[in-house]
């Protein structure tokens, strides 16, 4: 989902039509279930939870703790967890995970 948010943010900054982008990319090698499921919701600013951000944070914390106990470094997990935690501090914990796009829309 982080990749989807970053791709949409980049495409938006380049002035691309995001609806066309979703239709084009979804049928190719860059397509994914995350893109199909959350891309349209993100474009509509539909942050109704299928899975609450606050619960996803809890799960990522457990995974991060387990990784550390196993002496495994999961840099992407740590970064994504920090991004979500920042949004939770801003009061977005009861939104769906697709609200991660709000992290990228900050001024």
Model-found features: residue ranges?
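Helical "substrate-binding/catalytic lid" subdomain
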Residues: 1-107
């Amino acid at each position: 989902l982080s990749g989807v948010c970053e791709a949409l943010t980049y495409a938006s900054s380049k002035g691309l039509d995001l609806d066309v982008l979703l239709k084009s990319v979804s049928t190719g090698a860059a397509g994914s279930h995350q893109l199909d499921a959350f891309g349209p919701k993100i474009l509509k600013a539909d942050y109704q939870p299928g899975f609450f951000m606050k619960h996803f944070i809890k799960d990522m914390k457990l995974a991060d703790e387990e990784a550390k106990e196993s002496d495994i470094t999961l840099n992407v997990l740590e970064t994504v967890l920090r991004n979500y935690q920042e949004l939770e501090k801003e009061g977005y914990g009861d939104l769906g995970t697709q609200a991660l796009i709000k992290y990228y829309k900050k001024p």
